[in-house]
Each structure stands twice: as structure tokens, then as C-alpha cells.
């Protein structure tokens, strides 16, 4: 929270060791409006243990103390100032009664003082299906027992919302919900919003397309802190695609400071989040992508198949006999041509296929900070089709062209481009938005591609630092 709003931080600047005396982090106006403001109102949505409210309370408590003479600050006065911060500055929404009780205990111990904490019986459902009701209730002063207050105006809304809920499918699949919390936080019309959420929204999909567009085109997002490996933010926690937190400022209308944390390094760029047709995660990649785009008229997202290229679900298996063959997740076997319902013109061509799942666990790099991206890739000869376990990258009349495409996909150059728009464990045509189509009558190497697009030594080194070799 100190990165976005400032306040009193109990860790050193690297956030590796706790310090004996909390250090004050001053982020300028945002800090002056919130944690250094004894009249500020800060709302946390989805408190679990009261850690965020405790941070807020302590920071504002210290600001209240700063207005007093040192000789005034005896134990009674300090207790009074603490209770005032809890009762007047901090407001909390919880998802369960237990979370509410824990939060209250964190802020007040066993003392009976005013703690502005409520829980919603079905918070996620209300955020998703009754957003207006949520906003209206939270903005009513009487909901918080705020006597003499005409309108509840929050200076900041903060939180670590729930990330997903199981969607009840036949397999253990989940639907994201954190987007609803971000949207309703904005609807409360605070001066600032700061939340920590999964970064997979960068790529959209799974109900996140509208949220992605809203975030990328919202020029009130002043800062975005991005961790490609969630372990660098939450030790021991694997979140596919990484994690991010942001600062939304109602009075900001301009570029966003994007801060990437990758492999122990920090890199900052100032840019519009919607500068490109897709959100480019790493600022260091922008110059590379610009060079590629200047020389390219057609990209591979126009060629790659949709999911289920031949209309065959994952559970489809070979038949006892058939006039063609089926590649499925356990191998290959006979299949009947008449059972194929999609891409009939590809059946008799050479095809390059790949698994729809990425190789990297939860999108994480290895210990050296490098990713492989693609897992299974192979060339299917004519009269061989596949289930939806695979996607078809392209089809050709000749084996040579298919083999050359396969080698092209194995280059670090291509996998680097795909990595820029891959924040989930699934590969689809959208992940090939930045990959240029080549002449596949010849083979391509990384050295040739680097030369073709005029990459500098620094740009080449960045690609090599992120992508591992693939034989």
C-alpha cells in the first residue's frame, strides 16, 4: 500500500526486513489527502484479518499525533487519538462475520469502541448482480452510524478482493470476481482507489474482456505495479499470470507509470495503457514491437484456429477403424472422416499444431527468470486431425513449409512476442496478435529474425534473458 498511497511502512525499502521504527513514505498529494489527513475516510473492501485497516489506522493515528505537542502525548491521549482514527477515519466491509470479528479485534482488542465494520451476507453476489444496491448502502451515513454527516465521501478505497469463485462446471474451473470489486470501488466515487488483483486481466477472456477494455482506456489509472511472478509479491503463492496493484486517481487524466518487477529487477515506463491494440506488459518490449509492426502487414492471429479446430472435444477418442487418424491426448489412432465437423479443408493438408496449455507452471519463469511458453508442438501430415487438446497454428500444401513454421515457433523471437500477451495458462489465437507471418519456403533462425527487424544488442539481450532455448 505504501507504493501507491504512502503512509507508515513497517518494512525496509526493499520490503525484505521489518524495521524497528516504521518509516514514513510520502507520495505527495495522495498521501496528504489520505494518510496524512486527520479528516480522511478510507474504506477497505473485503477485509479478512484487519491488516489493511491496521495500516490505515496507524498511519492516520501518527498524523493525529503530529498535531499535538509531545508533552501532551501521554497514554490516555494516545489511546484517545487511536480510538478517534478507528472511529472516524477507517471503514471496513467484510465477507463473513468471522472476518468482521477478527478485524474488530485487530483494531480495538477487547475494548468496546466504535469500529466501522460491516459484513455482507453475500458480498460477491451483490457486487456482481446488485451493484447499485451495494453502492447506495455503503454511501449512506446512517449505515455507518455517522451522526451529523450528510454524505459519505471516501477519500480512498483499498483492498485485496476475492479473486475467483468455482463456476460449477464439470471440471474444477473458476470464474474471476475481482473485476466486480474494482468496478464498484470506482462507482463509490472516491478520490483514490488502490487494489491488488491478479494480472491475467491484461489478456481478457473468461469474462474479463469488458473489464480489460475499461481498465486500459481509463486514463485515471496513475500507477500500475506489475509482478510477472506472484511469488515476488506473495511468497509461496502461485497465481497464474502474476499479480498487480494500481493507483486510480479521480483527478488524473494522462499517462500511467508502469513498474515491472521481473527476475529481481525493477523497470519503469511512462505510457498510455491503450497505446497498442494489446496491452504490452514489459516496457522494455515496446521498442521491439514497434520495429516488428513497422515491417508487418499480417499477423498470426489471423491464421491460428479457434478452440476445437475440427469440432472434436477433448473426450473424443479414436474409432475402431477409419479412413483418417486422430491425434488426441493419449496418442494417435484411426478415425472416421465423417465425424469431423470443422475445418474440413485442413484434413488433407500439412498442419502445425500445439497444446492449448502453456508449458510454464502458473505462467512462472524458471529460477533464471526464463520461460519456455509453448509445450507440445508437432507437424500433422495429411489425413490426421486433432481434438481440442490442440490448436492449429497454420496449414500448408507442403511438408517443408510446415516444418519451417514449426522451427519458427521454436525461436526465442516468436515465443518472446507471444509471452507479451500471455498471462494465463491457455494459448489461443489472441496470443499470436504480435507474431508476424513469414515466408516459410525457407527456415528462420533467431539471428535472421533479429537482423530482419533491426534489433539492437540491448533488445536482443532482453529477449535472451526472458526466453529459454527450445530444441
Protein language model regions, located:
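A structural signal for short hydrophobic/aromatic patches embedded in well-ordered alpha helices
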Residues: 1, 103, 405, 463-464
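C-terminal substrate-recognition regions of SAM-dependent nucleic acid methyltransferases
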Residues: 152, 230-457
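Charged interaction patches that mediate protein-protein contacts
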Residues: 215, 455-460
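Short, amphipathic C-terminal "tail helix"
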Residues: 461-471
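SAM-dependent methyltransferase catalytic region
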Residues: 1-223, 229-233, 242, 246, ...
Amino acid at each position: 500500500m505504501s507504493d501507491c498511497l504512502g503512509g507508515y511502512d513497517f518494512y525496509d525499502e526493499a520490503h525484505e526486513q521489518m524495521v524497528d521504527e516504521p518509516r514514513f513514505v510520502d507520495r505527495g498529494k495522495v498521501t496528504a489527502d489520505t494518510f496524512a489527513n486527520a479528516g480522511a475516510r478510507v474504506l477497505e473492501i473485503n477485509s479478512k484479518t484487519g491488516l489493511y485497516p491496521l495500516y490505515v489506522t496507524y498511519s492516520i493515528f501518527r498524523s493525529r499525533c503530529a498535531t499535538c505537542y509531545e508533552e501532551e502525548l501521554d497514554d490516555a491521549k494516545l489511546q484517545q487519538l487511536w480510538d478517534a482514527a478507528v472511529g472516524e477515519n477507517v471503514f471496513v466491509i467484510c465477507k463473513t462475520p468471522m472476518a468482521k470479528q477478527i478485524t474488530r479485534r485487530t483494531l480495538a482488542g477487547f475494548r468496546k469502541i466504535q469500529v466501522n465494520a460491516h459484513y455482507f451476507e453475500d458480498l460477491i453476489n451483490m457486487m456482481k448482480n446488485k451493484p447499485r444496491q451495494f453502492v447506495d448502502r455503503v454511501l449512506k451515513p446512517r449505515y455507518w452510524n455517522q451522526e451529523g454527516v450528510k454524505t459519505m465521501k471516501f477519500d480512498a478505497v483499498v483492498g485485496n478482493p476475492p479473486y475467483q469463485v468455482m463456476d460449477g462446471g464439470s471440471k474444477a474451473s473458476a470464474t474471476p470476481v475481482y473485476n466486480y470489486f474494482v468496478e464498484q470501488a470506482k462507482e463509490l466515487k472516491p478520490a483514490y482507489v488502490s487494489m491488488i488483483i491478479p494480472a491475467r486481466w491484461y489478456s481478457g477472456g473468461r469474462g474479463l474482456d469488458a473489464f480489460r477494455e475499461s481498465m486500459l482506456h481509463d486514463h485515471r489509472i496513475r500507477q500500475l505495479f506489475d509482478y510477472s511472478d506472484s511469488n515476488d509479491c506473495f511468497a509461496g503463492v502461485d497465481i497464474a499470470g502474476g499479480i498487480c496493484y494500481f493507483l486510480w486517481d479521480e483527478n488524473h487524466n494522462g499517462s500511467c507509470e508502469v513498474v515491472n518487477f521481473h527476475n529481481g529487477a525493477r523497470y519503469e515506463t511512462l505510457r498510455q495503457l491503450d497505446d497498442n491494440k494489446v496491452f504490452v506488459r514489459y516496457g522494455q518490449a515496446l521498442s521491439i514491437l514497434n520495429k516488428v509492426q513497422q515491417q508487418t502487414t499480417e499477423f498470426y492471429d489471423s491464421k491460428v484456429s479457434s478452440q476445437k479446430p475440427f469440432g472434436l472435444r477433448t473426450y473424443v477418442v479414436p474409432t475402431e477403424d477409419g479412413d483418417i487418424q486422430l491425434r488426441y491426448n493419449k496418442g494417435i489412432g484411426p478415425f472416421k472422416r465423417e465425424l469431423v465437423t470443422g475445418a474440413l479443408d485442413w484434413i488433407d493438408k500439412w498442419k502445425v499444431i500445439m497444446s492449448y496449455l502453456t508449458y510454464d507452471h502458473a505462467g512462472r519463469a524458471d529460477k533464471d527468470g526464463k520461460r519456455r511458453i509453448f509445450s507440445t508442438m508437432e507437424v500433422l501430415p495429411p489425413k490426421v486431425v486433432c481434438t481440442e487438446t490442440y490448436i492449429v497454428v497454420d496449414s500448408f500444401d507442403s511438408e517443408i513449409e510446415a516444418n519451417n513454421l514449426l522451427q519458427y515457433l521454436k525461436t526465442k523471437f516468436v515465443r518472446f512476442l507471444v509471452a507479451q500477451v500471455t498471462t494465463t495458462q491457455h494459448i489461443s489465437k489472441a496470443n499470436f496478435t504480435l507474431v508476424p507471418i513469414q515466408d516459410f519456403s525457407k527456415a528462420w533462425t533467431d539471428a535472421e529474425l533479429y537482423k530482419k527487424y533491426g534489433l539492437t544488442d540491448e533488445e536482443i539481450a532482453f529477449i535472451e534473458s526472458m526466453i529459454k532455448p527450445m530444441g
